[in-house]
Swiss-Prot record:
Domain Ephrin RBD: 30-164
Signal peptide limits: 1-24
Stated name of the protein: Ephrin-B1
InterPro entries linked to this entry: Cupredoxin, Ephrin, Ephrin-B_Ecto, Ephrin_CS, Ephrin_RBD
Annotated positions of the Phosphoserine modification: S280, S286
Subcellular location: Cell membrane; Membrane raft
Modifications after synthesis and translation: Inducible phosphorylation of tyrosine residues in the cytoplasmic domain.
Domain of life: Eukaryota
Biased composition (Basic and acidic residues): 204-217
GO CC aspect terms: cell surface; cytoplasm; membrane raft; nucleus; plasma membrane
Keyword match Isomerase: no
Expression by tissue: Expressed on lateral floor plate cells, specifically on commissural axon segments that have passed through the floor plate. Expressed in cells of the retinal ganglion cell layer during retinal axon guidance to the optic disk. Expressed in myogenic progenitor cells.
């Protein structure tokens, strides 16, 4: 049987291997800058909203700030909508409510984790090279909290465009002139396509890249749909391949540790048997009678369980300790006729 120290070492090795595999399989995630959902937030640019480029594994916090002194509290209900809903500022059909900002004296924080597969049935799932939209059709007042048309989406362009897994520096100028604005693109795309010759000025203003990314996601592009499906398929294949490789490595390590423990156990058992065989009954036997024990029979030869320190046998002491009582091994002697026999006449 494996010793407790060996058992603890094997468990520690397995835990370290599992932790290492999890660290290798998990991409380098980061927490994006939180977004305060307020009409005073300057990040919501007119006609464009807020465009971010998260990667799989990143986290984004949307904060409903608490009421400030001297200003009325802004009531909002945030939705995850489709591109056409974001363009029309309408949440009438199939609304997906994310969070409701309706507690003036409390800061509400809603965290979005960009993951391709969610362990929760109601969790959000995102795909690479796809665009997702968050907006609100509330007007900021308590009476307009349940509005499904217009609201701050239309008046202040309060929307978040999330371009998952895309590169903000990837520029494709050809799409500005050949592609047609679709419902998935917002007002910035329409403005850019009206003046395609101002490409250099768009670069200097820092808006050119955002336009290209939004135009890239629209179905008007020639091979956009097939490219998205191919990239999604490739990402799924890569993910399953990584998971499969990790499982194979984990199984190989488990098999190696099992074989190692069996070898150690076999070696320990063989060593114990060799030491037990070396201790013969002749070397362990010691007569019970002695100088101070008169009247004892010579046949009562007692073999002590624990001999000298060099000939100590751990197996016999373990058995004796398990059963709780000392065990004596008595050598059998042939019966002898008594020396003194008296006959009554």
């Amino acid at each position: 049987m494996a010793r407790p120290g060996q058992r603890w070492l094997s468990k520690w090795l397995v835990a370290m291997v599992v932790l290492t595999l999890c660290r290798l399989a998990t991409p380098l995630a980061k927490n994006l800058e939180p977004v305060s959902w307020s009409s005073l937030n300057p990040k919501f640019l007119s006609g464009k909203g807020l465009v971010i480029y998260p990667k799989i594994g990143d986290k984004l916090d949307i904060i409903c700030p608490r009421a400030e002194a001297g200003r009325p509290y802004e009531y909002y209900k945030l939705y995850l909508v489709r591109p056409e809903q974001a363009a029309a500022c309408s949440t009438v059909l199939d609304p997906n409510v994310l969070v409701t900002c309706n507690k003036p004296h409390q800061e509400i924080r809603f965290t979005i984790k960009f993951q391709e597969f969610s362990p929760n049935y109601m969790g959000l799932e995102f795909k690479k090279y796809h665009d997702y939209y968050i907006t609100s059709t509330s007007n900021g007042s308590l009476e307009g909290l349940e509005n499904r048309e217009g609201g701050v989406c239309r008046t202040r362009t309060m929307k978040i465009v999330m371009k998952v897994g895309q590169d903000p520096n990837a520029v494709t100028p050809e799409q500005l002139t050949t592609s047609r604005p679709s419902k998935e693109s917002d007002n910035t795309v329409k403005t850019a396509t009206q003046a395609p010759g101002r490409g250099s000025q768009g670069d200097s203003d820092g808006k050119h890249e955002t336009v290209n990314q939004e135009e890239k996601s629209g179905p008007g592009a020639g091979g956009g749909g097939s490219g998205d499906s191919d990239s999604f398929f490739n990402s799924k294949v890569a993910l399953f391949a990584a998971v499969g490789a990790g499982c194979v490595i984990f199984l190989l390590i488990i098999i190696f540790l099992t074989v190692l423990l069996l070898k150690l156990r076999k070696r320990h058992r063989k060593h114990t048997q060799q030491r037990a065989a070396a201790l013969s009954l002749s070397t362990l036997a010691s007569p019970k009678g002695g100088s101070g024990t008169a009247g004892t029979e010579p046949s009562d030869i007692i073999i002590p369980l624990r001999t000298t320190e060099n000939n100590y046998c751990p197996h016999y002491e373990k058995v004796s300790g398990d059963y709780g009582h000392p065990v004596y091994i008595v050598q059998e002697m042939p019966p002898q006729s008594p020396a003194n026999i008296y006959y009554k006449v």
